[in-house]
Amino acid sequence: MAAKIRREDEVIVLAGKDKGKRAKVSQVLPTGKLILEGINLVKKHQKPNPQLGVAGGIVEKEAPIQASNVAIFNSATGKADRVGFRFEDGKKVRFFKSNSELVK
């Protein structure tokens, strides 16, 4: 099945502590979760590892967010939108359901 949200897509967070924020998808995980740039930051207590040259301390990192909690951002309308699929010239393409424009 083709993915409705892909890497480098701009999305809006629909639920959670970062609700309403826009971000770019940096990674799509096979478990149906996404990692967004600067969204869902958590503090991880990192243990030092001198063999790998990793310093210890409290590190902020991006945690995965469920794909159902985000919607793709339509720059033409300036709102969150839904994605559909259709065939054009024998290729399957994604389009916005509100205005039928292709997703870039």
Curated annotation (Swiss-Prot):
Swiss-Prot/TrEMBL keywords: Ribonucleoprotein, Ribosomal protein, RNA-binding, rRNA-binding
UniProt keyword annotation of RNA-binding present: yes
Keyword hit for rRNA-binding: yes
InterPro entries reported in the protein's UniProt record: KOW, Rib_uL2_dom2, Ribosomal_uL24, Ribosomal_uL24_CS, Ribosomal_uL24_KOW, Translation_prot_SH3-like_sf
Gene Ontology CC entries for this record: ribonucleoprotein complex; ribosome
Biological processes, Gene Ontology terms: translation
PROSITE patterns in the cross-refs: RIBOSOMAL_L24 (PS01108)
Pfam family, one: KOW
Single GO molecular function: rRNA binding
UniProt-listed NCBIfam families: rplX_bact (TIGR01079)
Subunit structure: Part of the 50S ribosomal subunit.
Cited PANTHER family: MITOCHONDRIAL RIBOSOMAL PROTEIN L24
Similarity-based family: Belongs to the universal ribosomal protein uL24 family.
Biological role stated in the UniProt entry: One of two assembly initiator proteins, it binds directly to the 5'-end of the 23S rRNA, where it nucleates assembly of the 50S subunit.
Protein name: Large ribosomal subunit protein uL24
Lineage: Bacteria, Pseudomonadati, Pseudomonadota, Gammaproteobacteria, Alteromonadales
